[in-house]
């Protein structure tokens, strides 16, 4: 991962951006951008980059919480993995978007017209031969309004 590239990238990329690479946009985002640039019929949209994710972790202190949770896992007891996952999910849901990210997200949403949108996850490690995230990430359809968009993100 090129940390400098990520830390110097925008929070939002247009869906047809040439910058929408796997490290910045995840697999789905990068592939949708490629299709859009090739003039396939892809709905308008935008990509929230991995910079937004890393800034969210820093602003909320979640990186430390994740590392602390990982240090306490007992891999011999799968139920602890589920409990840790649920705990971290609650922490992520409770964390507010940093103001810069929220501002750019709001502007991108309004540029689309402020109507109902779909929010799709896009992992930077998905679709790799040695990893599979199929069915493990959420999709939110018919998300209407910035407050709901922020919650879905």
Predicted regions and their residues:
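N-terminal beta-alpha lobe that positions the nucleotide/phosphoryl donor
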Residues: 1-153
């Amino acid at each position: 991962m090129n940390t400098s590239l990520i830390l110097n990238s925008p929070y939002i990329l247009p869906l047809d951006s040439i910058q929408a690479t796997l490290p910045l946009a995840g697999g789905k985002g990068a592939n949708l951008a490629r299709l859009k640039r090739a003039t396939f019929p892809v709905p308008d949209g935008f990509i929230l980059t991995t910079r937004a994710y890393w800034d969210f972790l820093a602003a909320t202190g979640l990186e430390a919480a994740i590392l602390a949770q990982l240090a306490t896992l007992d891999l011999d007891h799968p139920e602890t993995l589920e409990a840790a996952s649920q705990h971290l999910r609650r922490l992520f849901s409770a964390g507010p978007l940093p103001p810069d990210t929220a501002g750019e997200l709001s502007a991108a949403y309004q540029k689309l017209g402020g109507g109902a949108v779909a929010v799709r996850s896009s992992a930077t490690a998905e679709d790799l031969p040695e990893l599979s995230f199929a069915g493990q990430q959420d999709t939110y359809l018919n998300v209407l309004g910035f407050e709901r968009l922020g919650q879905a993100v």
